[in-house]
Amino acid sequence: TTKISEILWNCSYKNLTCYYSEDSYIQNNISLKNSKSFKKPLSPDQFLYCGEAPLIVSRSLKGEIVNHIKKYKTFPRVIILKKDIYFVAANVLKAREKEDVFKAQLYFNSKSNPNRPLSKNEVKKLTSYNLFKNRLRFWFDYTK
């Protein structure tokens, strides 16, 4: 967690906490083989808390974080390093909230019913608004 925090600090993201998830459900159900099930957000909440996509580190941690920041214009909120999951947030409480939302997505995708991720247009719409202020409005738009 210290190394991730240092990389983020060097990328001008100060005051962020990196939280290592010890949740047994997440540890048992996360696999790079099933990464399609968690690569795209299923709901506005997941987009809000976990970002557009988790960072799955396959090479250099520093290089992958820098590339993620360039691609998505923000820091990675979920970092997957082999079987280890890290949540990045302003504090531990916010990181645990992200952990709960990510866990819910894993649970919903573990069921036999296929779930439809947010479309590119929905992600674009969510990106253009202040998500925290308009959270409930997005949910009502999403369920139509």
PLM regions with names:
Residues 1-144:
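Glycine-rich flexible loops
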